[in-house]
UniProtKB/Swiss-Prot annotation:
Pathway: Glycan degradation; glycogen degradation. It comes from the Bacteria. This is Glycogen debranching enzyme. It comes from Serratia proteamaculans (strain 568). Belongs to the glycosyl hydrolase 13 family. Keywords: Carbohydrate metabolism, Glycogen metabolism, Glycosidase, Hydrolase. It is an enzyme of class 3 (hydrolase). GO terms for molecular function: glycogen debranching enzyme activity; hydrolase activity, hydrolyzing O-glycosyl compounds. It catalyses: Hydrolysis of (1->6)-alpha-D-glucosidic linkages to branches with degrees of polymerization of three or four glucose residues in limit dextrin. Residues 460-481 are annotated as: Disordered. Removes maltotriose and maltotetraose chains that are attached by 1,6-alpha-linkage to the limit dextrin main chain, generating a debranched limit dextrin.
Amino acid sequence: MTELTPGIAAPLGAYYDGNGINFSLYSAHATGVELCLFDEQQREVRLPLATRSGDIWHGYLPGGKPGQRYGYRVHGPFDPAQGLRFNPNKLLLDPAARAVEGPVADDPYLHGGYDRPDRHDSAELMPKCVVIDEAYDWQDDCPPATPWGKTVIYEAHVRGLTLQHPEIPQVLRGSFAALGHPVMIAYFKRLGITALELLPVQQHSSEPRLQRLGLINYWGYNVLAPYAPDNRYSSLRTDMTPLREFRDAVKALHKAGIEVILDVVFNHSAELDTDGPTLSLRGIDNPGYYWLTPDGGYVNDTGCGNTLRLDQPQGVAWVMDCLRFWVGECHVDGFRFDLGSVLGRTPAFDRDAPLFQAMLADDLLSRCKLIAEPWDIGPGGYQVGEFPGRFAEWNDHYRDDMRRFWLQGDISLGQFAQRFAASSDLFNQRGRAPYASINMLTAHDGFTLQDLVSFSRKHNQLNGEGNRDGSDRNFSNNHGVEGPIADDAIVQRRRASRQALLATLLLSQGTPMLLAGDEHGHSQQGNNNAYCQDNAITWLDWATADDSLTAYTAALIHLRQQIPALQHDRWWQEGDGNVQWLNAQGQSLSAQQWEQGDLQLQICLSQRWLVVVNATQQAVEMTLPAGDWQLVAPFTQEDSRAVLPAWNQAAHSICVLVKKK
């Protein structure tokens, strides 16, 4: 009979040291823990995890090898009104598992029980944790450490980005390996992006509701095992594990100077609400991991059924250990925190919350880019501009105001300039820098750029929610007809709007984030919440990509990298030579023009680059500042130099000129 020796309390999870496996699990309220080992025939051996150090239960399995499948059964009181939901009939996943095998089924046997513990054993239906050998040869890999001022982020989905790429071997498409394939790296370099921000790559499951509809959670925000690379993104080659494949991709991207940022989910878990399955945290230490209501229910500040509690030492330690794993063992360069306000709840939002303090003080995380989605749906959850220290934040003010400027025409030049200048009204405080504003026009959540100019309302019927899901506040404009099919005049107006929006994004101060596919003209057919569409709606179609738009985008990124005012990451000040704001006549704007003037503007950057903006319905003749000006790529206008200093700027357009030295 296999027996455990005491082992050690750290690290959490299952760690193979070359001679055996150390198992370590946190539970403050349990009365007992059983380690459950499974062979290839799913036969189970239960071993008491008898040694307890504080609230950590641990044991060592001599001779244990990588590939060992395991889970836990945790004993303790079942008293939902007090927040306690222990049920040893339910096999539980290790919250620190490095690998997980098998899907989560939609089955009532996974439920832990309502008023009394459910008696059905869930082991046969449950995924199993898998012990891995974490050794890896990183060779001479080192982080690119791109300065914020030079950073251009590209948000992408591992599967959707490469699944239909004709130049990538079919066995690799949609996988981690495809991200590091020479074809993709060459594309990233041509485009000019410096950081790849990946939608969640951690092992996740699809909600029971989606499974019943024949859909899946495509985006991956229903995270099951935050340490484990998702098997769905493995090429399934016999000599390759998901972790090794992910590391190989990171190493290849780093060699090309491209950073890797992970979208991580520490706001809720895949266990959902009281009707959800008992898979891990709920059965291990429910009150330790979740915010609970006075009657033992779940606080739902996330809209996903539960809210993780991260104000206590163990919750902080769990998240920190996970982040350190991804940085230390996988060499990632940063994180984007989904519904990031949850990280600072105590339960009200506090920028000095324990988790924030731990992250900002950690030596390993000090080199990482930290990006918050600065809201959740709970009380006081909207916290744009309020995150601490080195955090950057998704700026929805930028997104909405720039859409309104170009597609609705209902904001002032002053508002436009405020957003163009890194939203200093939101971020120029407490010593923060312009990079803190993550400027975006689109993201995975919402319309693509092509749909933004082709649809005036959402079309989410395929999601199975009666088109009730997704935002109705899009500030989009179909330019005269709903949908992709339109006459040439409308197509041209849409193209002009796309170009103006892209130029604005890539020439604004702050950190630009480009949604993968926007440079192709990718459409999701009007679906602005395609979280459950693992099909041609979300997969990029490389065969039909708009190559001219891609070239236009790449030229804009190249232009951005030439303008010092966009690189040095310091707030623009009056008279510092970084920016000068001029009206159509080449004069300083009056207060009235800032608030009520026509949407026409000249922005001189670094005393040499002139951004000419006309968001009105008609062409306008502008008087350029003194100097010998020349149009720069990607902008074109026949015989433009012949009419200087008068300049005729087309309706709904933007261009850049450079002053000859």
